[in-house]
Amino acid sequence: MAVNPFKPTAGKMPPILIGRHSIIEDFSEALTNGVGAPGRIMLVTGQRGFGKTVMLTEFRRIAKAQHWEVIGETASAGLVTRLIAALSPSGLRLDQANISPSIGISGIATASLGQAYFSAESNPLTLRNALNKRLGSKKLGKGKGILITIDETQAASHDDLVAIATAVQHVITDADESDTPDEDKKGVAIVFAGLPYMVNDLLDNEVTTFLRRALRRELDNVPLPDVKNAFLETVADSGKTISGEDALEAARQSEGYPYMVQLVGYYMWQSAQRRGSDVITADDVSTGVSDALLAFDDAVC
């Protein structure tokens, strides 16, 4: 049974990433070019439905393919505590964490700006030395590192962002102070993603310097020729066909808005499928656009 190839679900990888080649190259090249490459600290912004979460998923896929370790997080209370736990030896237990300028972890630890001092069984552990410990692992090859992605950055607390910025800057400095050749140094890459106007608000505090030094990329509408070609390729790969003219009309109706591209594609494909046809016609495109608009209104209103 044929399966609809279009995926208009939040955060779901589409069959083809369109119009994002430049940002993907920025990131991939940064991993290759070593510690200090601009793309190793990146801020990705865009309106809802523009594919920020999908971009982070793709970055993690790229990093894994290059034998990096990856940690994917979404900003919410306890972000720094979760990062420390993810970087720490298995079995390390964090209970009742409260991330603020002064952190208390009842019965286990106290912390400040991302520092967490654990009880007798472990050495004092901070986000900085948790990163350094993990980077020192023999499991990581020369020139590799740890990628951290943080989605919905606009929801991050001020103190979490200060803790992360401070830790990452120190880890970069620590690497500089080692005698290891640059091409062999293990490093950290971090990518933040969030809404433009809310992220702008975050730039007006103590993390301004760190985030402003980040390579900033804003996701925008996808060019219509790219959308048309994606429709042609995706439909063909699914076992159906669509004319160039109808694919262009579907692209125009989507206006290059990534979420709408997936909606239009999904419903026009489904229209043909319901007819038992392997050909997506102009009528299927029209039906698909109408259904997509209804679904879009339900999703955003």
Predicted segments, located by residue:
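A short, basic N-terminal segment
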Residues: 1-42, 86-89, 173-184
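Walker A/P-loop nucleotide-binding motif
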Residues: 38-58
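Conserved catalytic segments around the Walker B and adjacent sensor/switch elements
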Residues: 43, 57-79, 146
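Conserved NTP-binding/hydrolysis module of P-loop NTPases
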Residues: 65, 70, 80-113
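Conserved Walker B catalytic segment
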Residues: 117-197, 205-207
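A short helix-turn-beta junction within AAA+ P-loop NTPase domains corresponding to the substrate/partner-engaging
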Residues: 204-220
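Conserved small helical "lid"/interfacial subdomain of P-loop NTPases
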Residues: 219-246, 264
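Winged-helix-like regulatory helical subdomains adjacent to P-loop NTPase cores
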Residues: 252, 256, 260-301
